[in-house]
Amino acid sequence: TVKRSSKRGWWGPPSNCWVCTGFNKCCEHESHCMTFPTQYNRECK
């Protein structure tokens, strides 16, 4: 299922959307994903 991201874009992933591993966060690129406090809690930079 495709869910609306709490940030921007879509969890899917369409173009411009990188799903951060371990959490359904949608970022523009993998390098925008950051981890805190564990690898299962990710947000966009």
UniProtKB/Swiss-Prot annotation:
**The keyword Secreted appears for this protein:** yes
Subcellular compartments: Secreted
Task: Locate the coiled-coil region(s) and give their ranges.
Answer: none
**Is tRNA-binding tagged as a keyword?**
no
How is this protein annotated for GO cellular component? Answer: extracellular region
Name which cysteines form disulfide bonds: C17-C27, C20-C33, C26-C44
Propiece residue ranges: 1-2
Where is the chain membrane-spanning? none
The record's tissue-specificity note reads: Expressed by the venom duct.
Cite the entry's keywords alphabetically.
Answer: Disulfide bond, Knottin, Neurotoxin, Secreted, Toxin
Molecular-function GO term, any one: toxin activity
Provide the domain comment: The presence of a 'disulfide through disulfide knot' structurally defines this protein as a knottin. The cysteine framework is VI/VII (C-C-CC-C-C).
Q: What is the protein's name according to its record?
A: Conotoxin Cl6.14
Task: Give the originating organism.
Answer: Californiconus californicus
